[in-house]
């Protein structure tokens, strides 16, 4: 498929090592864009397919790469992998410009996540189809949030009309 050759080095079986050839292509391409006055948009999470070899539960292997993107919003290990990659890429020195991507003024902006969000994942049914290990983790995070937001079960019930449905006065997010 179109994402087979990408920034991750497949020889390691994970997505934690960068592919030197792909990185060189990116470096050269961005240097040529810069030479021609064209700014760069770096995307940190586009078609990365996480695997169990990344240190994640093996259930990740059964998920579509696009659906995996929602996990970074509530699975701490995925968020850490995203930060690790961001640091690797943004602190890498482009040999053609002599600058890191973090310091290169030709990098106009960096997209943390491309075309995905927690609400989008929920509306698109991704949340409903999560493997149990990730669904349980989301449930734990949700309950922690509710515990912090509402001082008691009674306050929670009042805000959600005691029926599990949020009242018109309560905040959804």
Task: Identify the residue ranges that each predicted region occupies.
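Active-site mouth of glycoside hydrolases
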Residues: 1-173
